[in-house]
C-alpha cells in the first residue's frame, strides 16, 4: 500500500537476505536533499516500543501488525531526540482481547520468476565480434577464432562440449522457483489476562541448478520460523503489565559463491572457450564432475556454483515488559509507565568446499568420436567436502533498553492539554 510521506525501495533480490546489505532496502521519510553523500538518513524504527532494524521489520508477518504509523514533523519526533531527526516509524503488533478463543490459519504457495532477462549476443556473433575487435586494434593480428571453428559451432553437428555455445544463464539458473508460507495465530483472554500468540513459517528458495553428481544441494533454501506472544495482565484496578516476546530463526543453505558473483560471471565468462563439464575419457572416466577450463586459474561459472555450499543461521529475540499505573485517583489524568526490553541477535556461518577437478579438451577424433582431456586440476583436488576457514564467522549482539514515561492529560471546556516526559 501507500503511506503518505514515506519513500521506500528495495534493490536486492536475494531470497532470504540475512543482513541489511543483502536486503539493501532504503526508507526515506523527510527527504535527503539537505544531507551530504554518505550521511545516515535511515528513520528510527520502533517495534512495540523497541528500536529495531529494517531486517527485523521485514520479518514481521503482515497478519501480526495492528498499526503502522509514520511520524515526521518536529513536534511528533521531539521526544526521540537526534535519533528521530530522520523521522520515526511506529509499528505495534496485535494484542489479546477478552472473549473466547479465536484462531486463524493461513497457507500460501508462491511461484516466483525473474521480471526481466538480459539478452546477450549468440556465440557465433561473439566470436566474429571478438575477432573484429582484435583486428581493429592491430590489423596484422591473428584472429582468435578460425572460420572453420565458427562454421562448425554454427552447424550444431558436433557435441556441444567440442564446440561450446554456452548460454551461461540457462546453465546456472532455473526458470522459476516455489516458495511456501504457513501461519497460525490465536487470540482471546479473560478479564485478567488477554493473549495473542502466533507462529509463522516461510520456506524461500532460489533458482540455482544443482548437478546430479553432487552429493549436496547448491540452490538457496531458507527456512524461517517466527514466534510471537503478547500478554496483557490486569494486576488490579489501574495497574497493567504488558509482556511482548518475539523470536525469529533463519536457517539458510546456499552456494559458497555469492549469487551476485554468479550472476556477474554468467554475463562475463566466455561462451565458447570451454564447456561447463566434459565427459570422461579413457584416463579420467571415473564418476566425478570434470569442470571445463582453458587454464588452471580460469573461473568456470558452473564450477563456482557447484564447488561447495554455505550454512548460515540467524536468530533474533526481543522480550519486553511494561508496567502501567494509572494514578487518576491521585491526580486526574496522570499515568506512569516503566519498561525494560532485552534484544539479542546472533549470526553464524560455516562454509563447506571441495577442491574441484579442472580439465581442458586436448583433442577430439572426428572419425571415432573419442577424445582426450588434459588435467589442469590443482594439487590435492578432491570432491570430498571440507570446512572453508575463510567462510566461517559468528557474531552476537545484546542490547538492554530502559524507559520511564509520565503522561498527563487534562481538558476543560473546549481545551485539551497533554504533557509527556520520557527518560
Region spans (language model):
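Small-side-chain secondary-structure face that scaffolds active or pore-lining regions
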Residues: 200-224, 254-256, 261, 312-318, ...
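Membrane-proximal, glycine/serine-rich, low-complexity loop/turn segments characteristic
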Residues: 1-44, 50, 57, 62-63, ...
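Flexible N-lobe loop architecture of eukaryotic-like protein kinase catalytic domains
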Residues: 72
